[in-house]
From Swiss-Prot:
It comes from Ehrlichia chaffeensis (strain ATCC CRL-10679 / Arkansas). This is UPF0102 protein ECH_0093. GO terms for molecular function: nucleic acid binding. It holds the Pfam family UPF0102. HAMAP family: UPF0102 (MF_00048).
Length: 122
């Protein structure tokens, strides 16, 4: 049975998933190869892992219906970095790639905002 709280969570999950699908489509149109969508490991998760021209992009997607930008916390950044390191450990063919952490923000009112190299680690 849906409670008001559960209903909101379902809506947020659907909106987030649709935002990720939109960004995947956008990346494919720009010539990126999508390696993984919703990569999860014990250390964290990454929304999208994509590559193009020896660049490996670990991408966080934030989606909002109303246009308010959703911040990414230092804790989330560290979690994504740990998951990225885990991914590369198990997929050694990407060890020589240039690593990038990108942030995509999408809302109906503001459209698409891309922040390449949103943070650094490697």
């Amino acid at each position: 049975m849906f409670t008001k709280k559960n209903y909101k969570r379902v809506i947020y999950n659907i909106v987030g998933y649709l935002g990720e699908i939109l960004i995947i489509w956008f990346l494919k149109c720009k010539g990126y190869y999508i390696i993984k969508h919703r990569y999860k490991c014990i250390l964290g998760e990454i929304d999208i892992i994509a590559c193009k021209n020896k660049y490996l992009a670990f991408i966080e997607v934030k989606t909002s219906i109303f246009g308010s930008e959703i911040p990414i916390t230092n804790k989330q950044q560290r979690s994504i970095i740990k998951a990225a390191k885990s991914f590369i450990t198990y997929h050694t063919k990407f060890e020589e790639y240039n690593i990038r952490f990108d942030l995509y923000f999408f809302s109906l009112s503001k459209g698409l905002i891309h922040i390449p190299h949103a943070w650094q680690e490697f």
